[in-house]
Amino acid sequence: YVWGGLKETKAEDMNKKWSSMANSIISIDYLGGKCQSARATLGDSGNSINFNWKENEAICNANFVLAGISLSFKMKLEEDHLTIEVLQNTVKELKNNKLQSVWILPFLGTVKEDTTPGYMFVPDGSGALIRYNKKGTYTSVYDERVYGKDASVDGLSEAGDLIAKRNNDYMIDTQKATIPVYGVVHGANQNAYMAVIEEGAEYSSVYASPAGMVTDYNWVSSRFDYRQAYSYPVNKSGKTIMTTQDEAEAYNGRVTFYFLSNEKADYSGMAVKYRELVKNAGILKRNEREDKEIPMYLHMMAGVVEEGLIFNGYNKLTSVKEAQDIVDNLRRNDIKNISVSYEGWQKNGISGHKYGTTSLDSDLGNEGDLKELHKMLGDNGGRFYLYTNPVSFNEDQARIASTSALTISKNYSSYTRSNTMLMYPTEYYAHPSDVVDSLADMVEDYPEYNLDVAKVGNMIYGDYSKNEKISRQKSKQILSETVSKIKKDKVLENPNQYLWNDTSEYINMPLQNSQYMYETDS
């Protein structure tokens, strides 16, 4: 089976710009004057590429003449897969233009409308299929950053109506892409490929365009972002100008395309192949614990802050003794395999405790009571987890100026909910170094306890603070290393793929996709 882009060099139903991109191994986006983005492809007039072959691999030198940008990439063909890797240290910017993004084989396996049966697979939440149909009218493509948005670059806010005082219960945020894969199927159980983003995933996005969105073709691709354009404040009144990162992010973008056929050529075959890959890489290991009974997960809220007229109060919800009674009652009803996560146990409870504190609120009980609850669950085959959120805090939990990471625009990294009736509609994200210190304190003060670690599992963000500039790539590395050092069991919520190996209990796995109009299956 021959995989390619367009059947024709110049498609009659596609303009020259898109036709050139569809027939290019790689294309680039670059930033010119006034930070305006433009695209260059190898099919554009004047651009060139040469290949240096050696057995089953080649070094390809691409020169985008009009853009004034050149780079090299490596292609290697082995058995059932093809790997393409952008060599970042070969990038040359000969004019004032700066490299923004690189697209790898953007139209590989493209299908015009429904001329071929099949679908595109995207890592949207639980995974989504976009079946080939006649062209439709859509307002957006699927364009999601792998491992979620970056709070240091992307504005984070909750989906909601602009005219409402509170959030719309029928509107949901888009699902995250926690796995760096996508794929294409040409006829179920006939031919397919699965693309795995192996390097640079934290800076990549999966982009899928259904027929009718710009062109009549269905196509999916990975895009590697090397620079961001952003608004930069120039005075205290809030005036901004558009600018771009001076230096590109330093990484090689690498994608491997695994070609599948016959009974393996569908989304189930992709899942089996990916499971094989992550098992062989040590990312996914068999859990040594074998449960004879289906485990029950209980998330208990110990206490919560209560808004007051002058001073905030505290509302005790579940004391340690009451938690023991709940567990004992379940045990007497023959439910023994219980995992309990205890949130708000620190002084002043949920949203009220100081960031990083590890002291138990005395209204809930004492450390002896906590140890008794821990032992009770363990003796009956269950687990007890202390809930900790080292990532985010509100304005009363810490000094924003000293604790919050900064965005590339020098604003505080934050997430704002549209519900203005909330006590704390905005939460801030701590410096990655503070996240590490907070987790280290928890491990030191409670060495015998398992931890329910909130948000670390599916959030990575850079920090552009003056004295602590940390890239998204570096943040991923240090947070992963910190989690791996926690030797006790850990609960992680919908964790990104790189933390699967350090996850004892996986909670809140997505059961659906974002339900875009063009997504046909979940």
Residue spans for each PLM region:
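Aromatic- and carboxylate-enriched substrate-binding clefts and catalytic-loop regions
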Residues: 337-522
